[in-house]
């Protein structure tokens, strides 16, 4: 093996240097480039070491000789790099992403995202609309709206030709990715143009890119809407339809190991690195003991009153979470007593629902604190009056013709005064059975079909167990 180039490295900065970007060649040897998007891990196996033959590949010539400030030398073997896309490289003969999304486009379905002022409507494969509704004193409804993009209709022949071209090139082009919560996530783009003219861009038409992202439990929710440049938008949609395509499945990036062998006369690991880690352990020890003590207290005194975070932006599972491991009986009792509350929503506003108590809309800010709007409060008399004029429960027929309760609806009125129509806010809460492999999955969403009149949807497998207890007014009780 030929002599390699050497470069000095201070012990404490060793990790930074190795995880940086190396020159492409050392002493005539071409080395693989390192990327900040792919995680690496340093390992110190000692002088007697055999490169792994399974997993991420290595080549004998892909190495550098590193010399620390203490004149310790190490031969560091660099991986050929894995980015988590190995399965994608296999031949795929299934439907294209466009074909997988085709049922969504043919259903004429729309998704909604409600923010503090604007509501966004994405009718898949057709258009994107941004609007705000207001009612004047005379009950005349004023709508302020902008189309952020529309799909250009094509003749069947043009559409067929374009689809054929797309399928021919799709297997060879790079998959688009977007950084979502620190993870590079693949998406399928759908361009929409010919939106409402933009006065800030010489009346050019607004346009949008709809980014469809795989999520197995999603219901085509709108994850985000962003104006990336003036009158040009990005809309991120979560859908389960793309998950059948290997190139669009989300996978965490694998960790690529860099093996640094000590050369003759050098310790197994650099002395300065050992010293640094020892100092860090001394700092961590008191904190770790305190964390362990807090965790024990939390496990000992934890109750089922902890709110459930639904649609947290700390995950990419918008509108879906997993409830803590409780028995169904406990959960049902606490839910019906109103002491177990659901929290849901993404974006500026979040929502809190406590059964038989209230529905709140709130925003938390680290500087200004928590802003809460009462959307509706529970009063049995008001609900009973509402139930006389509206459908409090809906039925569905099973395969053997038996009718079972599909949804129940409850009225919560007397919310905070609406600035637009000077009427109290109100909300209809729809409780629905959710079939899921996880018995404790729950989905919460909110719609505003009319100004300050809301619909809150709550779906869970637990609700399946109590729907049939609903009386003629839709009121639930603990099942026998």
From Swiss-Prot:
- Composition bias (Basic and acidic residues) maps to 163-172
- Name any Gene Ontology BP term: ERAD pathway
Q: Can you cite an annotated GO cellular component?
A: endoplasmic reticulum lumen
Its protein name is: Endoplasmic reticulum lectin 1
Read off the InterPro entries from this record.
Man6P_isomerase_rcpt-bd_dom_sf, MRH_dom, OS-9-like, OS9-like_dom
Gene of origin? erlec1
- Reading the lineage from the top rank, the first entry is Eukaryota
Disulfide partners: 110-123, 198-231, 214-243, 341-354, 418-452, 433-464
The residue range of the signal peptide is 1-27
Q: Which residues form the MRH domain?
A: 108-245, 339-466
Which phenotype arises from disrupting this gene? Embryos display head and axial defects during organogenesis.
What is the annotated role of this protein in its UniProt record? Probable lectin that binds selectively to improperly folded lumenal proteins. May function in endoplasmic reticulum quality control and endoplasmic reticulum-associated degradation (ERAD) of both non-glycosylated proteins and glycoproteins.
Q: Which UniProt keywords apply?
A: Disulfide bond, Endoplasmic reticulum, Repeat, Signal
What organism is the protein native to? Xenopus laevis
Location of the region described as Disordered in the Swiss-Prot/TrEMBL record? 152-172
What phylogenetic lineage does the species belong to?
Eukaryota, Metazoa, Chordata, Craniata, Vertebrata
Cellular location(s): Endoplasmic reticulum lumen
């Amino acid at each position: 093996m030929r002599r390699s180039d050497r470069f000095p490295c201070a012990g404490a900065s060793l990790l930074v240097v190795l995880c940086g970007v190396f020159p492409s060649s050392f002493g005539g040897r071409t080395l693989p480039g390192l990327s900040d998007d792919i995680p690496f891990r340093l390992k110190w196996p000692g002088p007697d070491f055999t490169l792994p033959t399974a997993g991420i590949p290595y080549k004998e010539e892909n190495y550098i000789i590193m010399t620390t400030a203490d004149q310790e030398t190490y031969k560091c073997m660099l991986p050929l790099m894995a980015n988590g896309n190995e399965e994608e490289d296999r031949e795929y003969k299934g439907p294209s992403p466009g074909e997988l999304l085709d049922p969504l486009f043919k259903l004429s379905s729309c998704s909604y995202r409600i923010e503090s002022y604007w509501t966004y409507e994405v009718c898949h494969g057709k258009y994107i609309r941004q609007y705000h509704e207001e009612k004047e004193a005379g009950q005349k409804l004023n709508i302020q709206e902008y189309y952020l993009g529309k799909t250009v209709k094509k003749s069947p022949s043009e559409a067929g030709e374009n689809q054929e071209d797309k399928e021919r090139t799709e297997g060879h082009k790079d998959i688009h990715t977007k950084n979502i919560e620190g993870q590079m996530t693949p998406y399928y783009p759908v361009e929409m143009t010919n939106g409402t003219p933009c006065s800030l861009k010489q009346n050019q038409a607004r346009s949008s890119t709809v980014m469809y992202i795989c999520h197995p439990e999603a219901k085509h929710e709108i994850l985000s809407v962003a104006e990336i440049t003036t009158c040009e938008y990005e809309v991120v949609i979560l859908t389960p339809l793309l998950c059948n395509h290997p190139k669009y499945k989300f996978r965490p990036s694998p960790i690529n190991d860099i093996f640094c062998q000590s050369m003759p006369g050098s310790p197994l690991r650099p002395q300065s690195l050992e010293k640094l880690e020892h100092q860090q352990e001394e700092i961590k020890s008191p904190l770790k003991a305190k964390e362990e003590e807090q965790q024990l207290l939390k496990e000992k005194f934890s109750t089922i009153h902890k709110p459930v975070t639904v649609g947290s932006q700390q995950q990419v599972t918008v509108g879906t979470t997993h409830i803590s491991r409780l028995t169904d009986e406990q959960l049902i009792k606490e839910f019906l007593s109103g002491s177990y509350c659901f929290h849901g929503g993404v974006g500026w506003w979040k929502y809190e629902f406590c059964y038989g108590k209230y529905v709140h809309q709130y925003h938390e800010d680290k500087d200004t604190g928590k802003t809460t709007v009462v959307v509706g409060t529970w009063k049995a008399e008001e609900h009973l009056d509402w139930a006389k004029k509206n459908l409090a429960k809906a039925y569905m027929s099973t395969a053997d013709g038996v009718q079972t309760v599909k949804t129940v609806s409850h009225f919560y009125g007397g919310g905070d005064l609406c600035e637009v129509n000077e009427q109290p806010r109100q909300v209809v809460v729809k409780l629905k059975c959710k079939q899921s492999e996880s018995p404790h999955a729950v989905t919460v969403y909110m719609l505003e079909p009319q100004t300050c009149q809301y619909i809150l949807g709550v779906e869970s497998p637990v609700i399946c167990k109590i729907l049939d207890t609903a009386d003629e007014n839709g009121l639930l009780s603990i099942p026998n």
